[in-house]
Amino acid sequence: MYESLQQMQEICETENKAFWELVMEEEANEKQNSYEEVFEMMRSMYRAMVQADENYDDRRSASQMTGGAGELMAKWNRDEKTLSGPFLGQVMERALKMAESNACMKRIVAAPTAGSCGVLPAVMITYQKLEKCPEDEIVKALFVAAGIGQIIASRASIAGAQGGCQAEIGSASAMTAGALVFLRGGSLQQIYEATALALKGLLGLVCDPVAGLVEVPCVKRNVIGAVNAVSCSDMAMAEITSFIPVDQVIDAMDEIGRNMPCQYKETSQGGLAVTPAGKSVVL
């Protein structure tokens, strides 16, 4: 287990390895599998994401709070009404669809959590489809995301109950930003800059699920995490940097999470959950 992204960068430079290779090798050693087996396991994760996207339907959740937003966004995209263009339009659509599928208890891939399951797939699937990216490159990008997520989990948290929504949507957005920079041919330093920028932008985000369900505001926050990742990848590719190094940003998230009142950490005792509309939900 590596202790920091800085440590991983130093190893990559010393051993002349790509970041994704380092992550894959660690996973193979831990599971006692071959590199090929681990690579194919990750491919199966990506294909499960694609299948979840393709199997979306616009049914509403059991609570009736969510459902159908993904199809509404799809129609908006088909009508070419979005100001954000085809890429971001499809990213938003897929993020909604994946998160709504989770709310309806359908099969998804936690990335890193079920509540943030729409962020990484939305960007990866859209990139593959619109940029005609080979599947193998997407799989490598998922290893990049996994390596970033591993460090966030070890230095801070990826659980809303421990660190608030910054730990879920924030982590997913950071992982996705780094993975996208990799796909776009950015350097490891640019991957780290995108990761830091994405996480910084979502620091302090609380976890305040209405009625204790992973629906409101969780579904639509997946869109925010995905769009944030894309914008931060653009900034990093433009050579814009984070004044605070990535490992220190992760540590800041941990500090914020530790000091965040418990009513903002998945207890449904604060924020949107205790608004009149939030308290009106009867299950």
Where do the model's predicted regions map?
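Generic N-terminal targeting/processing segments that precede catalytic cores or assembly contacts
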Residues: 1-106, 130, 239, 246-283
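Alpha-helix capping and helix-loop boundary segments enriched in small/acidic/polar residues
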Residues: 82, 111-114, 136, 160-168, ...
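Glycine- and small hydrophobic-enriched segments that form the cores of compact globular domains
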Residues: 83, 110-117, 127-129, 133-134, ...
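Acidic-glycine-rich active-site phosphate/pyrophosphate-binding loop
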Residues: 85-102, 137-156, 201-209, 244
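Conserved phosphate/anionic-ligand binding catalytic regions in large, soluble enzymes, centered on
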Residues: 105-123, 167-172
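Alpha-helical support elements that line or immediately flank enzyme active sites
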Residues: 121-132, 180-185
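A structural-propensity feature for long, helix-poor, extended segments
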Residues: 143-175, 179, 202-228
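Functionally critical mobile loop/hinge segments
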Residues: 182-283
